[in-house]
């Protein structure tokens, strides 16, 4: 993975951020049919239709092997269940399902080029 150098231009640094080499907060993403599409390296995730609980089975938008992604729940009253390899189209290989059920819970993932794997989880429940 390329590293930021002292002589990098602003565009080079922006490229590092967009490819997930530096954490950059993107928009809040709402689950749609079990999926989200990431555009940055950090996103809050909301349930579809403001449901109390929603399953996240697929994360689209992985761009480069080694890309890091941090997800947190958008609403303290809702639960986003990040599902481990739950269907044939799943891009998540995280070992076990993990619930983001408070605004302080997080999951950190890495894109391998074909799937997201869990690096760490943090539960404040």
Task: Give each language-model segment a name.
Residues 69-71, 94-98:
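Glycine-rich loops and low-complexity Gly/Arg-rich segments
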Residues 102-113:
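Extracellular disulfide-bonded cysteine-rich modules/repeats
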Residues 86-96:
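Extracellular beta-sheet repeat scaffolds used for adhesion and glycan interaction
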Residues 54, 92-94, 101:
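Sparse, context-dependent recognition of short Cys/His-centered cofactor- or disulfide-binding micro-motifs
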Residues 2-88, 112-125:
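Exposed extracellular interaction/assembly regions and N-terminal maturation sites
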Residues 62, 99-100:
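Residue-level "contact hotspot" at macromolecular interaction interfaces
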Residues 34, 96-98, 107:
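Residue-level detector of beta-strand structural context in well-folded domains
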